[in-house]
Amino acid sequence: MPTSKQIINKKQDEVSDIYGKEMIRVIRSLLKHKIIDTESLSKKTGYSINTVRRALYTLQKMGIVRYINKEDKTLWQLLETDYEKILDTLLEPYKKEEKAETGELLFICPKCGRKYTLDEAEMYEFRCPEDGTLLVANQ
């Protein structure tokens, strides 16, 4: 059974493949600072301002960050502080697309709302690894 760290690493690799490796570094910097301006984030990540903005706009569309205008400065505020949930949010549109293509059955934890593939559900013996609740099939 894969460890939580292995699962996160796999999700992180998938996010990097889809959005680029800069997305991971931007997210990690946001997790450290919670509220930060674009220029500072650019310096902290080592990426150009345009690259950072592209990542931020993607995160904004997904509801992970929001911008705040304060005294002629745009600040970005992280709305979700759980790294794995951020990765899940970024991967969700692709997982849904993949599910539609393959007809794969998904399982959901009715308590926390996390989604699992059949393989993951089997791996966790159809119990949510976060809270132990029995997973239900999503149709």
From Swiss-Prot:
Gene3D superfamilies: Winged helix-like DNA-binding domain superfamily/Winged helix DNA-binding domain (1.10.10.10). Keywords: DNA-binding, Transcription, Transcription regulation. Residues 7-91 form the HTH TFE/IIEalpha-type domain. It holds the Pfam family TFIIE_alpha. InterPro entries: TF_E_archaea, TFIIE/TFIIEa_HTH, TFIIE_asu, TFIIEa/SarR/Rpc3_HTH_dom, WH-like_DNA-bd_sf, WH_DNA-bd_sf. GO terms for biological process: regulation of DNA-templated transcription; transcription initiation at RNA polymerase II promoter. One of its GO terms (molecular function) is DNA binding. The winged helix domain is involved in binding to DNA in the preinitiation complex. Belongs to the TFE family. Monomer. Interaction with RNA polymerase subunits RpoF and RpoE is necessary for Tfe stimulatory transcription activity. Able to interact with Tbp and RNA polymerase in the absence of DNA promoter. Interacts both with the preinitiation and elongation complexes. Transcription factor that plays a role in the activation of archaeal genes transcribed by RNA polymerase. Facilitates transcription initiation by enhancing TATA-box recognition by TATA-box-binding protein (Tbp), and transcription factor B (Tfb) and RNA polymerase recruitment. Not absolutely required for transcription in vitro, but particularly important in cases where Tbp or Tfb function is not optimal. It dynamically alters the nucleic acid-binding properties of RNA polymerases by stabilizing the initiation complex and destabilizing elongation complexes. This is Transcription factor E.
